[in-house]
């Protein structure tokens, strides 16, 4: 069974330091750790954060052949904790590799078909990525 996970990989900038995050990236890593054949689809930056994300996804067994290597920066989510320990997030989205979806680099659904397609989370609401992915997904 082939599973395609499409969506953001980003860097959570925590008070203790940066870590690779993003709901879809975490989903892909979890599925790969469970032994599934998983390919991740997203724009991944060639900056230091992007290279760190690629390394972690690869280490966990996530296929990256369908991911786009981009010169744009990695999306970040800066995490702030209040006095009760509740988190708030400030996202750097605009102009990042993470949301640079273009139909020209997405896999051709006429040639390749996954058994399962998972699309989440922020890419489903951030334009133009959400429209590009919706139009592509209905063909899968």
Summary of predicted features, one role per range:
Residues 1-3, 56-58, 64, 83-140:
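Ribokinase/PfkB-type carbohydrate-kinase core domain
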Residues 3, 15-77, 81-86, 94-98:
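Substrate-binding N-lobe of the ribokinase-like
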Residues 10, 45, 123:
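Catalytic metal-binding/acid-base residues of hydrolase active sites
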Residues 11-12, 36-37, 120:
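General secondary-structure edge motif
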Residues 12-13, 126:
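Short, solvent-exposed loop/turn segments at secondary-structure junctions
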């Amino acid at each position: 069974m082939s599973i395609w996970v499409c969506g953001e990989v980003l860097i959570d900038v925590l008070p203790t330091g940066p870590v690779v995050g993003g709901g879809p990236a975490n989903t892909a890593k979890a599925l790969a750790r469970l032994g599934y054949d998983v390919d991740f689809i997203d724009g991944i930056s060639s900056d230091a954060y992007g290279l760190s994300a690629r390394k972690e996804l690869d280490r966990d067994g996530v296929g990256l052949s369908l991911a786009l290597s981009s010169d744009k920066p990695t999306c970040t989510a800066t995490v702030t904790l209040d006095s009760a320990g509740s988190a708030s997030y400030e996202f750097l989205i605009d102009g990042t590799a993470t949301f640079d979806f273009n139909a020209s680099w997405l896999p051709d659904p006429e040639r390749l078909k996954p058994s399962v397609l998972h699309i989440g989370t922020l890419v489903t609401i951030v334009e133009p990525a959400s429209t590009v992915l919706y139009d592509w997904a209905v063909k899968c």
